[in-house]
């Protein structure tokens, strides 16, 4: 390129973007520059060179600091005066400077004129300004220099020319800079010429630092350049001119002027760089790794030996094939590049994944050229074969028919025991089995394997403990070490166990051999050729001793580490406990100190607050450190027991058949007879395929060694897959018949097992036949002994092994002849495989996945090993839930095929859900009937109650329970019930024949007599006696055919005794009002003797009573007629309907009915309300009122279980009955008094039954009870067997008497009943009431027990069982039946020092129940724990009617006397003729521990809570009474209520005795103007509903007088453990006129 072209490119680059305005500005600047430079001295150097160099330098500065499309003048003005450092000033004006300026001016003018003409020619229109993208700027401003020889031609575009010219300027400046710089001073002509080019800033660092900042400023200004106006440009130009003339970089401006083409081209020699220098520079910049092998120590941390995992037993995959040179290069590079990286493994080699290349190709091989590609598409014709069907298990229709073959190879048979075995044969067989076991263990050599594993683990621990272990965190290292140590412990235990087994086995072999030699010496002949030789291998004592001691020390060290870790853990726990104890003790001291400082006023409050005893914290005991001597002694003892002693030679037994058998002529006669018997016996086998005999072996004689060789192969031609394969072993004796010894089942072979590959296997068999022989043969199934005295007897059964192999045959073409398993969905076998893929392959393929996964986890299989891949995949699939092997057999394999709808759709069906819930006997749907046939007919609200109960399962509702404790107890009882119901679900579904089949009994002519005809025939001719009718048996009905209205409750009221009689009413004025006098009072005062209400013989003019009975059940009321006198007789039958809850008449529902039958006795009083006595002769105006006297409450569950209740019951009469007294008639009741002993009260005789008679549900099936005794109990098996035997003997003698030995606790487990009896402390405050009166204390304790609410198990656990809870559970639940009350009361009496027993018998009305019997000084007392009453033994009104057994803390006595009534039996249990004891001399008492707690802890009940509960109950009862009187106004007499409220605490303290007169006087004093009728009710508190029912049954609200007033008071007395005594006083008041 010539200079003119270069000039044109440079000029176009600098000026094209700015146009004419820029040209004018440049001219002004040139004139200013010339004036500036005249002051300087002209240089002596040639002007061409100087201009060229100067321009080149200026071009370089421009390119470096200037961006494209930027005007030179504007940039210079923007750059400011500090772009370049100042030039050192000197006096340089002269001719040279002047001439240089003139030449510069002329050349510039010429260049400018040429540029203008070129621009006008090439660019007719000015080029618009635009901003360039950063990418273009970056492409333009590259740092790669270009040599002048590599310039491109001028055909390139203008942008390329601009960038290229800048690159050239930059290279020129770079070359000039490389030259040495001259020192400053007065220049010569050459120096003056070169001044502008080479005199640079002496501080170049400052320029370099400032340049990027200016560049940033320029970029910021350039962004706003296109938006500036014309005026702003002119102002900028003026400012730039001034700065150029006066600034410091005027020289720099001249450097940027455009020179001519020949001024900046320098001609010099070409630069050359040698190859050596080039390589040297490349070595400084580039790194070339070495190809030499890197030493191993450089690739591992210091002091670390390489570890080869493959030698330690871990699987290492095959590494990919890489050239060793490449591997060395990579290792050297990694060591230099990343010296601390994780690229190297423990073996010093680069980490590499196993080679992913398969050893065989995945794609099928291409067909050869000779074979035509259409050959595989040709049709192959095969003739159709007729298929033979056989039973089931047929091949699917898609399977090809054909003949298949199964080969059975029967090698031989050997007996491990036979009836003809002599004693020596028994020992020889045992010795042979032991030796086989020894050989098997030696082949496995598990001891050595575990020893090597233990050494490897110890070595791994030592390697992991190295502190310089790389690329592992401390947590990971510690975790690995802990895993190693845990595995070391486990491996050491296994190694010790294996060593002990080996040593024990060797000792046993030697022992049996010695016994065999002793037997041979004793019998003086030999029957077997066995001979045992013990070969000794000597060992090096020194090495053996060292190894032994090293192992001992290593084990001691490991055990010490374990104990130290355990000690450290215990020590940490001790420190924590000790700190807690110190804090507790400090708090206790602070409390004591605070207690001393409090005043006496606050003592009571603090005692009330601290009434709950705090749990005392015991001082912890520090753990004892481990004694190393003890550890060492234990290790050495264990080693001496299980290992070979050091220096002791190794014994290797060798069993051979080198012995000699004694000939027959040297043996005794019995042995010769045995050998003759063996010769007469022969054995053969039958082959049974699919339960059919297909072949049999030849009969072979039994050898003297009891071995039989067959050597036969049976080829079975089959069509279907085999169901079973069996061998039958037969034995023939002489010419007699054959005997089947055993059946041996053979597994169906796998489909991969073919003939030629099947190994010979041994399968064992045994026989249960009993054989006794008359010679030396020991027989089978009969005992024999090796001892002379017949001790240590053995009983062996016939057994042996059959050697066989079963495999599939191979056809002529090499294809196995196996019945195919069709892959289609048709065919039984295919469906079987699809339903259960694993179990369908046959019994040999069954695998327990749980055990397999457990074994894999414990064995720690290497998951990287390809050999384990199928196993690991199978385990992962099985454990993930996708597939599993069930631990049960499938009853319906094809259920999935017959499912007509999916599970999801079935679960969405409302009808199916309803049916499912009903079948599960959910309470809301238990007896749901008439379920609609379509889902659309079932409403969503049907499930609302059930879903609400599920949501509120854990929510405790206090609506039905006024206090929180009882609400919690009710919730807990519900949870216990659900748990127990689930546990006894099996018993409920264990049906008997009578449950399913209801039919009348076939008349039996001898059913009621002991003879052949019996008494049935005599009854036909028996005379009828109408005055003495006999009860006939009723038919029992079940719940299936019952509905509402079918069941009636029949109550027969017969008579009553000692009803309270009225007392004369006396007011303040000693005269009642006219209207308040009863008929009886007036009749008594009148002279007439004809009134039926008054008898002349009635002594002392007593007031009569007119009682009648009202029966209330489920709010249905019936009553009898009114009788007269204190001993009335009704003999009336009342009928009440029964309605089951929710219409459910099932057994479980009937058992859970909580309703009670209330039998109330009322006195009917007639009041004369006639106002005028003068009208008495013409009319009668009376009003009938009834006064409640007492009641008898009988639960319906008792009636249901007893079927009928017949007896005399004590009437519960309130302790205060105003207007009535118990003054008995002296004349009429004298005979009655003679029969009374300790009991006082009124009685009523009843007969209650249900019509029709219902079948009561059995609480638990006998079989289920037996099963629970066997599986759910912690009692000793011998004790349970003794209980079963004891109960069987007792039931055989007296089947109707109750005999109880074991019971079921709250968890469903069987417990021996005496464990429930133990002295337990009653509440302390009860013992302080009567400290000197034991009898009063006993009555008070009995009353406390009776205050705990009664809840029978038949209601709480309906249809399940009778559960017994311990006393602490009973007090926590505050609910229980007779057994819990009796156990608690008996335990209290035992604590008080009384002789007490639990009485299991039958009472009225409870039925089978539990009472308590105590022995006082000279008589027995029978206590009813539910009522708190006690009765004498000879009390005729005692509710206990029969006694079955007595239970004490240490024994059980069953009543074997002829009578069972308490009146007629003797309670002296020391007489064995009267009482059969469970524990006796033959079975002594084993000292059973009690299930009861050591002591009972009582919490005091909060009195404030009791008072709040009292107010709430009173409010509820008042609201109920007002609801019961909807047609009348109910007025409350507050004054009377206050009086009654003050009276109720007196009743609680005196228990209702000896305060009636004081109470009557108080009421007469305060309420004399009122006729008062009322009574207090006393009940234990459980919930509100029983209180409401009790008040309702009294009928106090049934008074219709307009001026009647009511009074109601409630008092609750709290006892410990939240036991509450409730008193309710209800009264009605009528003002006297």
Curated annotation (Swiss-Prot):
Source domain of life: Eukaryota
GO cellular component, one term: cytoplasm
UniProt feature, compositional bias: Acidic residues: 602-615
Compositional bias segments (type: Basic residues): 26-42
Occurrences of domain C2 (ranges): 1031-1209
InterPro entries: C2_dom (IPR000008), C2_domain_sf (IPR035892), CC2D2AN-C2 (IPR028928), CEP76_C (IPR056288), CEPT76/DRC7_peptidase-like_dom (IPR056290), DUF5523 (IPR041510), Tectonic-like_complex_comp (IPR052434)
Annotated region (Disordered), positions in chain: 1-188, 200-245, 590-673, 1068-1094
UniProt cross-references to SUPFAM superfamilies, sorted A to Z: C2 domain (Calcium/lipid-binding domain, CaLB)
The UniProt record lists the keyword Coiled coil: yes
Record keywords, A-Z: Cell projection, Cilium, Cilium biogenesis/degradation, Coiled coil, Cytoplasm, Cytoskeleton
Basic and acidic residues composition-biased segments: 1-12, 99-115, 154-174, 209-223, 234-245
Keyword Metal-binding listed: no
Consequence of gene disruption: Embryos show randomized left-right axes, holoprosencephaly, microphthalmia and a variably expressive curved body axis. Cc2d2a null embryos also have cilia defects, which are exemplified by the absence of Arl13b staining in neural tube and surrounding mesenchyme.
Residue stretches of biased makeup (Polar residues): 1068-1092
Subcellular location field: Cytoplasm; Cytoplasm, Cytoskeleton, Cilium basal body
Coiled coil: 440-501, 554-611
Gene Ontology terms describing biological process: axoneme assembly; camera-type eye development; cilium assembly; determination of left/right symmetry; embryonic brain development; heart development; kidney development; motile cilium assembly
Function in brief: Component of the tectonic-like complex, a complex localized at the transition zone of primary cilia and acting as a barrier that prevents diffusion of transmembrane proteins between the cilia and plasma membranes. Required for ciliogenesis and sonic hedgehog/SHH signaling.
Subunit structure: Part of the tectonic-like complex (also named B9 complex).
Protein name according to UniProt: Coiled-coil and C2 domain-containing protein 2A
Protein's organism: Mus musculus
């Amino acid at each position: 390129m010539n200079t003119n072209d270069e000039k044109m490119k440079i000029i176009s680059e600098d000026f094209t973007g700015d146009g004419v305005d820029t040209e004018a500005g440049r001219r002004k600047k040139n004139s200013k520059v010339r004036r500036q430079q005249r002051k300087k001295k002209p240089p002596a150097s040639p002007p061409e060179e100087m201009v060229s160099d100067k321009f080149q330098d200026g071009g370089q500065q421009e390119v470096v600091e200037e961006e494209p499309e930027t005007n030179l003048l504007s940039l210079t003005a923007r750059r400011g005066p500090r772009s370049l450092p100042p030039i050192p000033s000197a006096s340089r004006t002269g001719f040279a400077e002047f001439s240089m300026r003139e030449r510069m001016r002329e050349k510039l003018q010429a260049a400018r004129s040429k540029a203008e003409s070129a621009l006008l020619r090439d660019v007719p229109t000015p080029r618009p300004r635009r901003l360039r993208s950063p990418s273009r700027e970056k492409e333009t401003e590259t740092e790669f220099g270009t040599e002048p020889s590599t310039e491109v031609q001028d055909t390139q575009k203008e942008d390329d020319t601009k960038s290229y010219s800048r690159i050239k300027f930059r290279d020129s400046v770079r070359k000039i800079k490389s030259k040495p710089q001259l020192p400053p001073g007065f220049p010569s002509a050459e120096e003056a010429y070169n001044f502008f080019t080479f005199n640079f800033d002496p501080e170049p660092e400052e320029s370099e630092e400032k340049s990027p900042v200016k560049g940033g400023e320029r970029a910021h200004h350039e962004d706003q350049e296109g938006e500036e106006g014309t005026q702003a440009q002119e102002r900028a130009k003026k400012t730039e001119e001034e700065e150029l003339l006066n600034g410091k970089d005027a020289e720099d401006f001249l450097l940027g002027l455009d020179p001519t083409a020949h001024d900046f081209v320098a001609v010099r020699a070409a630069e050359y760089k040698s190859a050596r220098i080039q390589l040297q520079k490349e070595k400084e910049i580039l790194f070339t790794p070495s190809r030499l092998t890197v030493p191993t120590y450089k690739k591992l941390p210091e002091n670390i030996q390489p570890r080869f995992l493959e030698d330690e037993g871990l699987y290492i995959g095959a590494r990919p094939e890489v050239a060793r040179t490449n591997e060395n290069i990579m290792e050297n590079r990694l060591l230099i590049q990343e010296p601390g990286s994780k690229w190297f493994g423990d073996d010093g080699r680069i980490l590499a994944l196993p080679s992913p290349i398969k050893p065989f190709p995945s794609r099928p091989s291409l067909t050869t050229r000779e074979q035509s590609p259409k050959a595989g598409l040709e049709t192959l014709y095969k003739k159709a074969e007729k298929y033979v069907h056989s039973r089931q298990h047929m091949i699917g229709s898609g399977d090809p028919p054909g003949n298949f073959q199964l080969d059975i190879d029967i090698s031989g048979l050997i007996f491990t025991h036979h009836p003809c075995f002599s004693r020596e044969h028994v020992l020889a067989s045992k010795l042979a089995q032991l030796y086989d076991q020894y050989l098997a263990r030696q082949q496995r050599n598990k001891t050595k394997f575990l020893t090597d594993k233990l050494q490897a683990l110890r070595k791994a621990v030592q390697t992991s403990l190295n502190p310089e272990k790389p690329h592992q965190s401390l947590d990971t290292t510690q975790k690995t070490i802990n895993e190693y140590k845990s595995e070391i412990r486990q491996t050491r235990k296994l190694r010790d166990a294996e060593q002990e087994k080996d040593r024990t086995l060797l000792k046993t072999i030697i022992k049996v051999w010695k016994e065999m030699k002793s037997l041979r010496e004793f019998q003086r002949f030999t029957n077997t050729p066995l001979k045992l030789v013990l070969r000794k291998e000597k060992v090096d004592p020194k090495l053996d001793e060292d190894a032994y001691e090293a192992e001992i020390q290593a084990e001691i060290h490991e055990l010490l580490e374990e104990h130290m870790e355990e000690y450290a853990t215990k020590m940490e726990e001790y420190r924590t406990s000790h700190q807690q104890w110190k804090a507790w003790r400090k708090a206790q001291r602070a409390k004591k100190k605070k207690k001393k400082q409090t005043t006496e006023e606050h003592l009571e409050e603090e005692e009330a607050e601290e009434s709950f005893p705090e749990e005392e914290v015991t001082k912890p005991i520090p753990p004892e450190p481990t004694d190393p001597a003890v550890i060492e002694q234990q290790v050495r003892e264990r080693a001496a027991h299980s290992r070979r002693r050091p220096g002791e030679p190794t014994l290797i037994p060798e069993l051979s058949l080198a012995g000699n058998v004694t000939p027959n002529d040297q043996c005794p006669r019995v042995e010769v007879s045995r050998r003759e018997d063996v010769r007469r016996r022969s054995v053969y086998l039958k082959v049974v395929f699919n339960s059919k005999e297909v072949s049999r072996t030849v009969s072979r004689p039994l050898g003297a060694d009891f071995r039989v060789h067959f050597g036969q192969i049976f080829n079975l031609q089959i069509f279907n897959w085999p169901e079973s394969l069996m061998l039958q072993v037969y034995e023939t004796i002489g010419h007699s018949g054959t005997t089947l010894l055993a059946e041996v089942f053979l597994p169906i072979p796998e489909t991969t097992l073919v003939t030629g590959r099947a190994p010979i296997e041994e399968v064992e068999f045994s026989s249960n036949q009993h054989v006794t022989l008359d010679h030396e043969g020991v027989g089978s199934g009969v005992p024999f002994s090796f001892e002379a005295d017949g001790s240590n007897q053995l009983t062996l059964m016939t057994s042996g092994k059959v050697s066989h192999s079963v495999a599939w045959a191979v056809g002529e073409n090499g294809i196995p002849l196996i019945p195919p398993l069709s892959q289609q969905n048709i065919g039984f076998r295919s469906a079987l495989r699809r339903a259960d893929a694993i179990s369908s392959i046959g019994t040999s393929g069954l695998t327990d996945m749980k055990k397999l996964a457990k074994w894999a986890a414990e064995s720690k299989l290497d998951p990287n090993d390809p050999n384990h891949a199928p196993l690991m995949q199978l385990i992962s699939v099985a454990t993930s839930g996708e597939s599993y092997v069930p631990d049960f057999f499938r009853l319906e394999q094809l259920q999935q095929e017959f499912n007509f709808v999916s599970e999801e759709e079935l679960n969405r069906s409302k009808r199916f859900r309803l049916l499912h819930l009903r079948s599960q006997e959910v309470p809301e749907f238990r007896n749901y009937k008439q379920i609609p046939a379509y889902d659309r007919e079932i409403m969503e609200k049907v499930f609302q109650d059930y879903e609400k109960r599920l949501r509120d399962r854990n929510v405790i509702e206090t609506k039905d329970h006024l206090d929180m404790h009882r609400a919690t107890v009710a919730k807990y009882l519900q949870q216990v019930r659900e748990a127990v119901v689930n546990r006894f679900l099996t018993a409920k579904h264990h049906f008997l024949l009578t449950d399913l089949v209801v039919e009348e009994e076939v008349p039996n002519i001898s059913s009621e007599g002991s003879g052949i005809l019996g008494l049935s025939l005599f009854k036909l001719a028996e005379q009828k006696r109408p005055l003495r009718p006999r009860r006939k048996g009723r038919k029992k009905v079940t719940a299936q055919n019952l509905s509402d209205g079918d069941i009636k409750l029949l109550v027969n009221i017969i008579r009553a005794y000692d009803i309270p009689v009225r007392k004369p009413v006396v007011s303040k004025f000693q005269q009642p009002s006219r209207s308040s006098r009863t008929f009886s009072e007036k009749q008594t005062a009148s002279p007439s003797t004809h009134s039926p209400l008054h008898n002349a013989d009635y002594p002392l003019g007593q007031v009569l009573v007119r009682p009648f009975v009202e029966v209330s059940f489920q709010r249905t009321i019936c009553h009898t007629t009114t009788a007269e006198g204190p001993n009335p007789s009704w003999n009336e039958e009342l009928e009440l309907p029964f309605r089951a809850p929710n219409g459910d008449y099932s057994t479980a529902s009937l058992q859970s009915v909580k309703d009670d039958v209330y039998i109330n006795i009322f006195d009917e009083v007639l009041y004369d309300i006639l106002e005028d006595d003068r009208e008495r002769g013409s009319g009668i105006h009376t009003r009938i009122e009834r006064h409640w006297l007492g009641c008898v409450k009988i639960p319906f569950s008792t009636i249901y279980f007893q079927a009928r209740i017949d007896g005399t019951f004590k009437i519960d009469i309130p302790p205060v009955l105003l207007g009535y007294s118990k003054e008995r008639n002296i004349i009429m009741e004298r005979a009655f008094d003679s029969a009374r002993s300790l009991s006082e009260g009124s009685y009523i005789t009843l007969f209650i039954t249900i019509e029709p008679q219902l079948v009561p549900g059995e609480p638990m099936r006998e079989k289920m009870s037996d099963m629970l005794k066997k599986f759910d109990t912690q009692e000793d098996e011998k004790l349970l067997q003794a209980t079963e035997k004891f109960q069987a003997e007792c039931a055989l003698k007296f089947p109707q008497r109750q005999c109880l030995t074991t019971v079921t606790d709250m968890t469903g487990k069987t417990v021996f009943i005496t464990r429930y009896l133990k002295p337990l402390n009653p509440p302390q405050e009860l013992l302080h009431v009567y400290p000197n009166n034991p009898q009063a204390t006993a009555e008070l304790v009995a009353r406390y027990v009776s205050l705990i609410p009664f809840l029978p198990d038949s209601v709480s656990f309906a249809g399940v069982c009778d559960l017994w809870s311990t006393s602490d559970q009973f007090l926590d639940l505050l609910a229980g039946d007779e057994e819990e009350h009796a156990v608690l009361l008996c335990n209290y009496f035992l604590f008080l020092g009384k002789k007490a027993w639990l009485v299991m018998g039958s009472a009225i009305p409870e039925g089978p129940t539990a009472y308590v019997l105590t022995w006082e000084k000279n008589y027995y007392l029978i206590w009813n724990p539910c009522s708190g009453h006690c009765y004498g033994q000879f009390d005729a009104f005692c509710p206990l009617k029969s006694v079955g057994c007595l239970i004490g803390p240490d024994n059980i006595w069953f009543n074997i006397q002829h009578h069972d009534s308490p009146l007629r039996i003797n309670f002296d249990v020391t007489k064995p003729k009267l009482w059969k004891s469970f524990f006796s001399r033959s079975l002594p008492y084993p000292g059973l521990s009690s299930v009861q707690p050591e002591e009972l802890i009582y919490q005091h009940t909060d009195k404030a809570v009791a008072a709040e509960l009292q107010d709430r109950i009173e409010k509820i009862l008042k609201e109920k009474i007002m609801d019961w009187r909807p047609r009348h106004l109910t007025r409350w007499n507050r004054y009377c209520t206050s009086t009654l409220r003050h009276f109720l605490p007196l009743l609680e303290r005196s228990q209702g005795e000896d305060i009636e007169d004081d109470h009557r006087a108080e009421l007469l004093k305060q309420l004399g103007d009122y006729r008062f009728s009322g009574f207090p009710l006393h009940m234990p508190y459980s919930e509100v509903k029983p209180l409401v029912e009790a008040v309702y049954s009294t009928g106090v609200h049934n008074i219709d007088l307009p001026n009647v007033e009511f009074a109601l008071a409630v008092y609750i007395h709290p006892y410990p453990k939240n036991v509450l005594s409730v008193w309710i006083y209800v009264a009605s008041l009528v003002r006297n006129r």
